Amino acid sequence: FEVGIENQDDILLKNEVAKFVFKFKDNANEKIVNKEKLEEILSNGEKRALYILQILFEIEAQKNTNKPILLIFDDIVDSFDYRNKHAVVEYLDDIRENINFKIIIMTHNFDFYRAIARFGASKFMIHRNDEREIVFGRGEYTNEFIKSLKKNDENIKKNFITLIPFVRNILEYTKNEKDKEYLLLTSCLHMKDDTKNIKVEQALNVLKNYIQEYQANINKDDNLLDFIYGTCDEIANTNNINPIELQNKIVLSIGIRLKAEEFMLSKVNLQNEITRNQTRNLYNLTKEQNAINDKQDFIIRKVLAITSDNIHINSFMYEPILDTSIEHLVKLYRDIKEI
């Protein structure tokens, strides 16, 4: 099909918005369909593309008006829309050169955020505080997030814990699920037979094997599970906790899931080892065996809803964790501790 403009003269002479028509051709036959009719049968993705096309025409029409114009883009790119994402980034880079355009870009897409951060403009991460005020924090994580975790700074313990799922993902893709190092890191993130006996040094040695020049000045003789829980306690008890810092959210998510699994294992009669989707399958067992009460069930379901996707280190999985408030995670951690 071809896209045409029904009111081309009016766009040029009267600055009207473009009215699109679609010409569908099948051999010698041609049928013209207007935008309103077409929207009745388009998918959401196709409607989005059509909407963007309409906006682009309107922006282009305003380029030469010599009037100051504020452009606000709100979640213009979907998480998995790689092809259009790069096109949108390049277009935004182009139009920002126009001195008449002032641009505000809002997004939940972490990968898109990092892509446009190279423009060098002001960057903010926004959260809502306890008084329900909207707070603009300094934009972080514009460079490689994983590289920042290699630093021996005040976040060293949180950085170390955050790197565990990242390296586990590397092993998952490069080796197999029977690999000893993969199994060790799995036991750091899920309650297995050996989880309570793992030392910090064991996990640290695996991280060093896959992260170049990684050093962490932490107590290697500590029990890893106690180390994770202790770090979660420090985060939960911090005054004026950083609401944006990803490490806080990832570490709390890991601690919450471990606490939940530890609790459920104490309640069920487990006949066979669970090899996949452990938290979910443990919850299913508690229901089958009628092992938990309604209050406990409510808390565990919140754990399943929040933490599952937050412990994978890639661009899209940042989106749910960025949207989850730190206060919500702290409360859930305290709830699961007291369950």
Language-model features: where?
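Walker B catalytic acidic pair
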Residues: 74-82
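Structural recognition of the conserved hydrophobic beta-strand(s) that form the central parallel beta-sheet
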Residues: 101-108
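Aromatic- and carboxylate-enriched substrate-binding clefts and catalytic-loop regions
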Residues: 77-78, 92-93, 97
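GG-anchored amphipathic helix commonly corresponding to the ABC/SMC/Rad50 NBD signature/C-loop
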Residues: 44-71, 86-94
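Short regulatory helix/loop adjacent to the ATP-binding pocket of P-loop NTPases
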Residues: 112-123
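Extended helical coiled-coil dimerization/tether regions that scaffold
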Residues: 1-42, 61-64
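Glycine- and acidic
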Residues: 31-41, 58, 66-75, 155-162
